[in-house]
Amino acid sequence: MKFSKGWGAVLIIMLLLILDQALKIWIKTHMQLHESIEITPWFYLYFTENPGMAFGIEVIGKLFLSIFRIVAVGFIGYYLYKLVKDKYNFGFIACVSLIFAGAIGNIIDSVFYGVVFDHSFGQIASFMPAGGGYAGWLHGKVVDMFYFPLIQTVLPDYVSYTHLRAH
C-alpha cells in the first residue's frame, strides 16, 4: 500500500489526540494542581490549568474563547486539507497536523473538562463527580502539562504576578 500524505496527517492527529487526552486525564486524576514530576533535569510534567488563552491571559469571555477555538480549528483543518490536496511536503503537513491536534485537544478540554471533572484546587480531581463538574459546557479549563526549564532566571522584586496578568 502506498503512503498517503492525507492518511499520514490523520494518523498523526489521532495518535497525538489519544496520547494528549490519556495523559491529561491521568494527570488530572493523579496529581494536584501545580504538582510536578521530573522526567529528566530539563523536562517535567507540571500540572497547571489555563483559564484563558496563552499564559492564562483572560481578555475575552470563556464562551467566546471556546467558540473562537472551534472556528480557528475549522480554518486550520481547511488549511491542512489544502496542503494535502496541493501535495505540499509531508514534513510541513506533519507540523500543521501537530498544531491541529493540539488545538483540537484544547477544544476537548474547554468543552468537556468542566462538566466531567471537579475542581483541582487543593485536591486531586475526580472523574464524573456525583455533584457534577466545576463548570458548564464550553467553560472548562485547558490542562497544560509540559515544562522545560531550559533557562533559570528570576524576575526582579518590583515585578509581581499581578503586573503580568492582562486586565
Predicted region positions:
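Alpha-helical transmembrane bundles and membrane-interface segments of multipass inner-membrane proteins
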Residues: 1-165
